[in-house]
């Protein structure tokens, strides 16, 4: 529970908002933990896409009070023996969100603190664990926090939403079920990391930033620094070995000039990205995640 005593659940799912599924989950959260603040992270992620969901939840501790419970779910294996996992992570203290990349804007201060994630044990927490590590992890099996006979087609409600509310209300994390060893926590295979060699940066498109159609890569700002690249450096970006963009690295979209002009920038998560000014890039060209990216100084 946050230090101010007001419980918070940040809720992400693939349930959509065209029926009452999310409302059922939130109603139960409120019934179990009256007064809880529920923040909707995203309910429109691609159904069953564990890797996409992982990207939406990894940065959340930077922006939430200590003690927040992150209820995160896409449950392709609903109704099977796949259980949920609840773990505590420790967010390190940090200053401004993007260091030198924050320009002249003031950063923010975040004291270190612990947070709880609950998710299906299907790899959804892969990136969270990689980024933050964890202090303790448990299988969610105690019938004090989940139904004795959970609805098999709705584990997102039964095995994530309901126990998240019990945790937000103060139920001890170490009593939700047995402790899990590290090798029992499922991870998905991560793509090969970006590389820097001889001034050439190589990476991939990790995802499309919907609904804007921007292309995000796995080339981090630290990779750019290693290659001596900063804002206004003229770059040549080769996409999938076919499309070439000769552009400077700039802070934001409007620096591209005209509406529709392409732009290379650092996204809010600290990674190199490619877009068009106030227009989609991915959709007109049918560009997808997984395409290769090569960057050099022009």
Curated annotation (Swiss-Prot):
Reaction equations catalysed: fluoride + S-adenosyl-L-methionine = 5'-deoxy-5'-fluoroadenosine + L-methionine
Origin superkingdom: Bacteria
UniProt xrefs under Pfam families: SAM_HAT_C (PF20257), SAM_HAT_N (PF01887)
EC number assigned by the record: 2.5.1.63
Species name: Actinoplanes sp. (strain N902-109)
Ranges in a coiled coil: none
Alphabetized UniProt keyword annotations: S-adenosyl-L-methionine, Transferase
Family designation: Belongs to the SAM hydrolase / SAM-dependent halogenase family.
Name of the top EC class for this enzyme: transferase
S-adenosyl-L-methionine found in the keyword field: yes
Entry annotated with the keyword S-adenosyl-L-methionine: yes
Matching InterPro entries: Fluorinase (IPR030978), SAM_HAT_C (IPR046470), SAM_HAT_N (IPR046469), SAM_OH_AdoTrfase (IPR002747), SAM_OH_AdoTrfase_C_sf (IPR023227), SAM_OH_AdoTrfase_N_sf (IPR023228)
Positions that bind S-adenosyl-L-methionine: 14, 19-21, 75, 156, 209, 214, 268-269, 276-278
GO molecular function: adenosyl-fluoride synthase activity
Biological role stated in the UniProt entry: Catalyzes the formation of a C-F bond by combining S-adenosyl-L-methionine (SAM) and fluoride to generate 5'-fluoro-5'-deoxyadenosine (5'-FDA) and L-methionine.
Protein name as annotated: Fluorinase
